[in-house]
Amino acid sequence: MEQGTVKWFNAEKGFGFIERENGDDVFVHFSAIQSDGFKSLDEGQKVSFDVEQGARGAQAANVQKA
């Protein structure tokens, strides 16, 4: 799993971006967040995640709050 920091996340639209440790950004969709209840992330929050190749490129999967 990789570590990263939430760059921004729009809870209304259900997606955002995580900055990877190498400086690249990766797309994150709320459905990839591993938590109960309302699935959202906060700007600046530390997370761990896997990276999968989606239809539009790299995207985060199995996102867990650190």
Curated annotation (Swiss-Prot):
Induction: In response to low temperature. One of its GO terms (molecular function) is nucleic acid binding. The keyword Translocase does not apply. One of its GO terms (cellular component) is cytoplasm. It is found in: Cytoplasm. Residues 4-63 form the CSD domain. This is Cold shock protein CspC. It comes from Bacillus subtilis (strain 168). The lineage of its organism: Bacteria, Bacillati, Bacillota, Bacilli, Bacillales.
